[in-house]
């Protein structure tokens, strides 16, 4: 009998501890599959964020480092410069990357550091209680803006890919929405392209993933997928922003 589906070697045997419908698990598995296909598991050093994916080191079978909040690009930069033969990726959420870590991600991209970043945009601070994030949509409710985000008070959402695309350093920037099987395939293709760019020494790359947070959005997992397509993609359109 032919085996057509199995657990990637890039994942450990530890079960994911995420909320039902959370898309971190999908992205974790996709990263693991790509590491398997490119024979990177034994060569990789991943950098964990602070946030819901803080325990990512329990799930990935490659070497992992835990970074302080927002500092994953700086840590990844240091690792890659000291160990240039290693493959290095960083994994960050929107509060981690686009708020406290804004300086780190902008300057890593501006320098063209030869690292890969996977950026999870679920428009909320998940681990700390559903507060407004830099990516929270106008009118979207959060615990820190219960009446909805008001641009007169809270400003406007930050579009990370568009912002980084103004720099000369990035070699590849893409945003994907894995809300369907076709979307998951696009996610895998994007992550693989990002990883291949690093292998080729092309410099900085980032894949932004539009994800759900059923717990803090207070919606069913299915309704969350629809919400991404109907509300997030008009503000954060999927597509390739840089590909050198």
Show which residues each predicted segment covers.
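Thiamine diphosphate
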Residues: 1-126, 189, 193
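Short, hinge-like loop/turn segments at secondary-structure boundaries
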Residues: 62-65, 108, 133-137, 223-226
């Amino acid at each position: 009998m032919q085996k057509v589906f199995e657990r990637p070697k890039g994942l450990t045997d530890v079960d994911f501890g995420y909320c039902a419908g959370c898309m971190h698990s999908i992205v974790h598995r996709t990263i693991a599959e790509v590491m398997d296909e490119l024979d990177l598991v034994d060569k990789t050093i991943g950098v964990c964020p602070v946030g819901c994916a803080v325990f990512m080191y329990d799930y990935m079978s490659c070497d992992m480092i835990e970074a302080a909040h927002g500092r994953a690009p700086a840590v990844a930069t240091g690792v890659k410069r000291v160990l240039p033969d290693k493959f290095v990726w960083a994994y960050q959420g929107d509060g981690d990357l686009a708020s406290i870590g804004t300086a780190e991600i902008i300057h890593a991209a501006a320098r063209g550091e030869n690292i890969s970043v996977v950026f999870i945009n679920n428009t909320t601070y998940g681990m700390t209680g559903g507060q407004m994030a830099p990516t929270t949509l106008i009118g979207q409710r959060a615990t820190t803006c219960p009446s909805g985000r008001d641009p007169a008070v809270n400003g406007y959402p930050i579009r990370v890919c568009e912002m980084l695309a103004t720099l000369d350093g990035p070699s590849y920037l893409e945003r994907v929405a894995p809300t369907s099987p076709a979307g998951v395939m696009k996610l895998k293709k994007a992550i693989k392209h990002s990883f291949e760019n690093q292998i080729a020494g092309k410099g900085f790359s980032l894949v932004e993933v539009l994800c759900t947070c059923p717990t803090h959005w207070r919606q069913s997992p299915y309704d969350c997928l629809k919400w991404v397509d109907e509300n997030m993609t008009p503000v954060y359109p999927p597509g390739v922003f840089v590909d050198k």
